């Protein structure tokens, strides 16, 4: 019978409650261990055999069991006889020294046993007031054990006798570190014992295991998350993590590695996303890596989060995701879109979402095409990649990010003056909703479905309220009034200021600022011809009016000063007009040729007050004066204040002034020639690199909206997955409460040269009705189409059954409640029975599906427009 069996046989309730018995038994075990240690100490050449090793490990395990019995039995923290023996004899230190001298074949066995001993000390400590890890005779050997496992942050530690798989000792070591981190959460004071002298061994040792396979990697990630959550308020630990470790780099590098293992093609039709069985684990690893990255960003110190966001952008988005979208393989591009969409829908931490938005709006290809325009370009084609592109764009829309919507939708609408403020005011009227709602319901084909309008009224109201709440903190309302630097043109002067709730219309987004003289003529203080002083006398300027005007300036809309000379000839009144209708009236004097030439001289005498001074009018257009008589006549009407100077003094003043002006003009011309020569030399060296948008280079139309309208127009030719994703995109886009978008999407336009949604739907309806009349038993095709849609919906629900429940899960409408990303893994692909279709059968099937989808779309749009006056 082994000694362990003997120990178990002697176990009794009396033994369990007798500390003296513990001490006696401990002494016996220690004598055995001490003798084994002494043999190696006396004779360094002594070779330890297997039985000798097992005897030491077994007795050490029993000694630690007795130690934990003593520690847990004490009501208050105190050092008992057994713990004191560990301290005075330095038992753990001596055992580590002995084990390091073992042969390689025995060292791994001893290493694993020591890890289990420490795991027992950590996990079996049930006393809240006395954790043995605070004692140096216990803590220092633990640190030495960590050094034993120390290795590079990225590469595995692999000895000659080991392969690259995680060993059993490493698995137990990660479990030990995880339990230590759990103790840190239970007692935060322990953090000071493990983080000292700018060293955090427990955290550093976890980094190489972050992306290990199986439970080992999950335990390491959980442990790191626990550490960073406990130290979220500790700046010194945050600095250590970002500056002294490679944690942030490994985090994003591992994410990139998970992405590189994903399949280069996705099964299914683009709406149904399936992967081969061999890639299931890789997809699960990628999803877990995204969740871990997001969880770290939500719990860690702000400095750590900022560092992670930086590497997430540079190391993952721009170096991995972006190149995948620039390949020539459309299958791989479509798969990459699915993976990016999974990233967008998984990550919710604002800084990481901001990084994704930054890539969408600023990254360009070699031809200068912005990333989101690249995605939009893949919509054309109607294949699987087109379907995934529509779904990815829909995920952009669901972000409800003002910058994204400004780039994709609002910027082209605002800069191309899609509507006046008077036209947009119609959006607020309830009568518009009833009229337009009926117009969209009239677009339902004659062969349409039984009306489910009440369901759409309920679901759209919920989503419109949620979308309005998402947009509540946007900077601008995009209603043609508070549109910032893109104020829409007014139909009249009175209309220019209608619905203005603040005194000055200006923009914090504008690229041009007239401060501090933005509300005066030009960039200089106001000049009143009534205050002309005597010739040769300095003018006494009165800044009272200017100060009053400056006091009226709305500080919320003041822009930083800029150097107007940088704009050169680009800064013309016609371009400034896009900034603000009121600002335009004040800054038109910036260009002298435009302001002076545009208005002739006006000389008006007062007809209502004969006592008014002669200079009660404003003169302009002095460049039009070509004869001396007119010039004298104008001067005679001015009142000159002060005493008249002698003619000699006046002539001297004129000559002096003329000479100074002539000299200044010569110097100016010489300087301009010199600057021109320098610019010609410097110009080849200059290279302007810009990201994002120019303040002048705007597209004529929104590429996204244009693509959507083109897709609706070809509804009968498109495949079912494409039409479904397209209508889902329209459904999400139409819920935005901004008046300019609502007007563009829903209201009919007088301009017949441009396509509009309502007219397109009417055209598609007419086409479907005509085609339906020529198809025999079209009602049967409608029933088959409904069965196909139901079967497809069942497959998608089956794929998404294990995914987190969402608010859209029980929505019975067609364009809401879908899950674009299935959980990792592949489910059986069920298909309805099919046969060799003739060309006529394909046409009939597509027409029936188009009729069903159009019926749902019209009901959805009618429900939205009917409630816009209540939401907007």
Swiss-Prot record:
Biased composition (Basic and acidic residues): 829-841
Stretch list, region Disordered: 800-841
InterPro entries according to UniProt: FHIP, FHIP_C
Family: Belongs to the FHIP family.
Entries under PANTHER family matching the protein: FHIP FAMILY PROTEIN CG3558, RAI16 PROTEIN-RELATED
Entry protein name: FHIP family protein CBG19667
């Amino acid at each position: 019978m082994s000694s362990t069996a003997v120990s178990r046989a002697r176990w009794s309730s009396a033994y369990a409650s007798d500390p003296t018995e513990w001490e006696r038994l401990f002494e016996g075990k220690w004598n055995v261990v001490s003798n084994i240690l002494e043999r190696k100490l006396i004779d360094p050449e002594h070779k330890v055999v297997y039985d000798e090793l097992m005897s030491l490990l077994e007795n050490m395990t029993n000694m630690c069991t007795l130690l934990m019995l003593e520690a847990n039995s004490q009501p208050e923290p105190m050092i008992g006889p057994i713990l004191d023996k560990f301290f005075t004899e330095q038992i753990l230190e001596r055992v580590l020294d002995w084990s390091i001298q073992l042969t390689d074949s025995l060292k791994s066995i001893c290493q694993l046993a020591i890890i289990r001993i420490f795991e027992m000390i950590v996990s079996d400590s049930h006393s809240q007031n006395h954790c043995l890890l605070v004692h140096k005779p216990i803590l220092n050997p633990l640190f030495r054990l960590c050094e034993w496992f120390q290795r590079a942050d990225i590469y595995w530690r692999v000895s000659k006798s080991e392969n690259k798989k995680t060993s059993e000792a490493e698995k137990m070591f990660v479990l030990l570190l995880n339990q230590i981190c759990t103790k840190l959460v239970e007692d935060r004071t322990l953090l000071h014992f493990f983080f000292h002298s700018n060293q955090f061994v427990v955290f550093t040792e976890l980094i190489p295991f972050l992306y290990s396979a199986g439970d080992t990697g999950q335990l390491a990630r959980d442990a790191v998350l626990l550490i960073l959550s406990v130290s979220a308020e500790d700046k010194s630990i945050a600095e250590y993590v970002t500056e002294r470790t490679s944690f942030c780099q490994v985090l994003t590098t591992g994410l990139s590695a998970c992405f590189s293992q994903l399949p280069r093609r996705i099964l299914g039709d683009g709406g149904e996303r399936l992967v081969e069985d061999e890639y299931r684990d890789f997809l699960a690893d990628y999803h877990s890596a995204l969740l871990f990255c997001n969880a770290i960003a939500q719990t860690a110190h702000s400095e750590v989060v900022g560092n992670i966001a930086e590497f997430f952008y540079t190391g993952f988005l721009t170096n991995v995701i972006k190149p995948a979208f620039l390949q020539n393989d459309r299958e791989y591009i479509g798969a990459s879109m699915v993976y990016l969409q999974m990233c967008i829908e998984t990550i919710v931490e604002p800084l990481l979402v901001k990084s994704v938005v930054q890539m969408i709006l600023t990254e360009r290809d070699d031809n200068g095409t912005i990333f989101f325009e690249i995605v939009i370009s893949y919509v054309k084609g109607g294949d699987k990649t087109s379907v995934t592109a529509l779904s990815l764009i829909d995920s952009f829309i669901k972000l409800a990010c003002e910058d994204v919507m400004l780039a994709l939708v609002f910027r082209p609408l605002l800069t191309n003056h899609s509507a006046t403020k008077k036209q947009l005011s119609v959006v607020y009227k309830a009568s518009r909703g009833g009229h337009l709602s009926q117009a969209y319901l009239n677009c339902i084909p004659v062969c349409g479905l039984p009306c489910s309008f009440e369901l759409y009224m309920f679901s759209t109201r919920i989503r419109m309220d949620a979308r309005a709440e998402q947009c509540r903190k946007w900077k601008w309302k995009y209603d043609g009034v508070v549109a910032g630097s893109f104020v829409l043109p007014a139909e009249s002067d009175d209309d220019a200021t209608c619905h203005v709730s603040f005194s000055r219309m200006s923009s914090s987004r504008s690229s041009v600022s007239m401060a501090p003289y933005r509300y005066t003529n030009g960039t200089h203080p106001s000049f009143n011809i009534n205050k002309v002083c005597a010739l040769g006398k300095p003018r006494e300027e009165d800044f009272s009016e200017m100060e009053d005007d400056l006091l009226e300036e709305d500080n919320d809309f003041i822009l930083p000063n800029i150097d107007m000379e940088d704009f050169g000839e680009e800064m013309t009144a016609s371009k400034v007009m896009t900034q603000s209708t009121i600002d335009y009236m004040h800054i038109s004097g910036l260009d002298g040729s435009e302001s002076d030439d545009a208005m002739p001289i006006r000389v008006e005498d007062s007809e209502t007050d004969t006592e008014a001074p002669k200079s009660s009018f404003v003169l302009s257009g002095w460049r039009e004066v070509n004869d001396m008589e007119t010039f004298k006549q104008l001067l005679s009407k001015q009142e000159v204040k002060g005493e008249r100077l002698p003619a000699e003094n006046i002539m001297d003043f004129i000559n002096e002034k003329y000479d100074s002006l002539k000299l200044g003009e010569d110097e100016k011309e010489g300087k301009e020639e010199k600057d021109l020569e320098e610019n010609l030399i410097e110009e080849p060296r200059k290279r302007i690199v810009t990201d994002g948008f120019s303040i002048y280079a705007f597209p004529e139309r929104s590429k996204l909206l244009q693509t959507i309208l083109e897709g609706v127009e070809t509804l009968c030719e498109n495949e079912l997955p494409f039409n479904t994703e397209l209508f889902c995109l329209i459904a999400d886009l139409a819920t935005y409460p901004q008046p300019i978008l609502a007007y563009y999407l829903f209201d009919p336009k007088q301009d017949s040269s441009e396509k509009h949604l309502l007219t397109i739907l009417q055209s598609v309806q007419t086409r479907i009705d005509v085609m339906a009349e020529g198809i025999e038993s079209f009602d049967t095709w409608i029933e088959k189409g409904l069965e196909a849609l139901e079967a497809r919906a069942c497959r998608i629900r089956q794929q998404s059954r294990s995914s987190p429940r969402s608010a859209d899960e029980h929505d019975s409408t067609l364009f809401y409640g879908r899950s674009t990303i299935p959980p990792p893994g592949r489910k059986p692909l069920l298909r309805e029975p099919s046969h060799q279709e003739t060309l006529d059968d394909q046409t009939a099937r597509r027409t029936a599906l188009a009729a069903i989808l159009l019926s749902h779309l019209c009901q959805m749009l009618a429900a939205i427009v009917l409630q816009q006056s209540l939401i907007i």
